[in-house]
């Protein structure tokens, strides 16, 4: 089950990697601005993504219980909520994003480029949120092969749109960083069209209750929110600390921010591998509990952790051995290539703890106890932010040492989530 999710997530990560690769050819300022604006967008986006994770847990549970007709109810009620949320977030970003960024970014050049990116990128909320609900459906019902096809379509669209809009091809003006934002939003629109067409053509919509649009059901909305709310808040807060981390690094200088963005994008491939196994573990845990197979949960989690290690470790060893080869994918600026090497090494070492931490954390959410998952991560993030504030903002260390914050975070999440799963109170929870 993890393989199609992995391919899907890797292809989605290619959206970010494509933007970075194009910006690395435009300039150092654009490369840094794409990093901080991209993370800012992701902070807002994660509210919707968190809701999708909550609906995925519910869809998986109903699928495991063989209550297939209720899957469509969860899907459509979730879709209604997400479209309303997308509208609210779109308006809020158009009104306040520039002001928020200006309070946090010290470089006028980076600020101007970041504002250009965000102005166009927020149009993607509507397409990305709707597409997220389709992913929740396919993962929750264990029909994950569809995600691979969809992601290939999205990535190819993004590459084409970026090439045309960033550099000004086919008679269009060169839009630079704004072109990357427009291209990403258009790629998400193409992805959504694919999901709609594929679902209508290949899925038994009547079996899953997808053949008709139900009326708005406030009671069911509350039921979904009772699970999703904690994931939404957790996702938003988690990415907010990541955004603050990049703001801290931006104050170290434009080069430091560019290096951090390079490390983030090189980390994207192994991170998506880990998240694929974590997402699969969450869905399988929820399905097992729904089917009354709680005694098999621990073994399933251990298997996903070791499989994640087996997939990620060879790649990380290659990256650590040939860091400059991977850095040059995203930039051809010589001083950045050399300066980013130590940071890439630290990033690779962090996966020793990030692999089990992410699988265990997703498994906690898969039990349905999303409130506990929220508090476990909040506890880890408190220490993470204390460490970041002291090491990066106050001590102003090199960006290489700043990246050790990931080791601190991963170690704490591994310890907290592992202790919760061993305790076993999740066996008695129903949703």
Positions of predicted regions on the chain:
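Short runs within selected transmembrane alpha-helices of multi-pass transporters and secretion channels
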Residues: 52, 121-140, 147-158, 180-196, ...
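Hydrophobic side chains within alpha-helical segments
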Residues: 15-16, 22, 59, 138, ...
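Small-residue-rich hydrophobic transmembrane alpha-helices
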Residues: 31-94, 128-142, 146-147, 259-323, ...
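Transmembrane helical elements of multi-pass membrane transporters/channels
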Residues: 1-19, 120, 154, 187-191, ...
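Short alpha-helical transmembrane segments in multi-pass integral membrane proteins
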Residues: 1-2, 59-126, 172-229, 285-350, ...
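Generic alpha-helical transmembrane segments of integral inner-membrane proteins
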Residues: 6, 10, 14, 18, ...
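Helix-terminus/linker motif at the lipid-water interface of multi-pass membrane proteins
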Residues: 10, 14-32, 101-108, 164-175, ...
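Hydrophobic alpha-helical transmembrane segments of integral membrane proteins
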Residues: 1, 13, 43, 47, ...
């Amino acid at each position: 089950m993890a393989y199609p999710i992995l391919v899907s997530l890797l292809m989605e990560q290619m959206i970010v990697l494509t933007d970075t690769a194009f910006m690395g050819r435009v300039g150092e300022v654009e490369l840094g601005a794409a990093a901080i604006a991209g993370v800012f967008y992701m902070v807002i986006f994660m509210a919707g993504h968190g809701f999708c994770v909550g609906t995925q847990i519910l869809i998986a549970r109903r699928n495991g219980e063989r209550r297939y007709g209720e899957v469509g109810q969860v899907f459509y009620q979730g879709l209604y909520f997400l479209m309303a949320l997308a509208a609210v977030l779109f308006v809020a970003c158009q009104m306040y994003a520039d002001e928020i960024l200006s309070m946090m970014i010290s470089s006028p050049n980076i600020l101007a480029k970041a504002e250009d990116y965000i102005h166009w990128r927020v149009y993607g909320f509507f397409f990305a949120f709707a597409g997220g609900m389709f992913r929740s459906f396919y993962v929750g019902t264990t029909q994950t092969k569809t995600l691979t096809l969809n992601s290939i379509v999205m990535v190819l669209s993004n590459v084409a749109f970026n090439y045309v809009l960033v550099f000004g091809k086919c008679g269009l003006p060169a839009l630079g960083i704004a072109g990357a934002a427009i291209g990403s939003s258009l790629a998400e629109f193409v992805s959504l069209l694919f999901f709609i067409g594929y679902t209508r053509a290949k899925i038994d919509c009547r079996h899953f209750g997808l053949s008709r649009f139900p009326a708005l059901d406030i009671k069911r909305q509350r039921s979904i929110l009772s699970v999703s709310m904690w994931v939404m808040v957790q996702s938003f807060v988690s990415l907010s600390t990541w955004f603050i981390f990049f703001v801290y690094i931006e104050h170290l200088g434009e080069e430091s921010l560019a290096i951090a963005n390079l490390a983030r994008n090189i980390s994207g491939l192994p991170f998506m591998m880990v998240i694929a196994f974590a997402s699969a573990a969450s869905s399988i845990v929820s399905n097992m509990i729904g089917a009354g197979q709680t005694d098999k949960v621990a073994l399933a989690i251990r298997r996903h952790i070791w499989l994640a290690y087996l997939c990620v470790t060879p790649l990380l060893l290659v990256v650590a051995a040939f860091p400059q080869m991977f850095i040059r994918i995203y930039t051809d600026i010589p001083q950045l290539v050399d300066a980013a090497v130590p940071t890439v090494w630290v990033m690779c070492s962090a996966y020793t703890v990030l692999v089990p931490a992410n699988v265990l954390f997703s498994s906690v959410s898969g039990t349905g106890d999303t409130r506990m998952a929220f508090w476990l991560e909040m506890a880890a993030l408190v220490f993470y932010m204390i460490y970041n504030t002291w090491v990066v903002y106050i001590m102003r260390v090199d960006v290489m040492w700043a990246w050790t914050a990931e080791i601190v975070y991963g170690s704490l999440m591994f310890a907290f989530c592992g202790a919760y799963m061993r305790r076993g109170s999740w066996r008695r929870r129903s949703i």
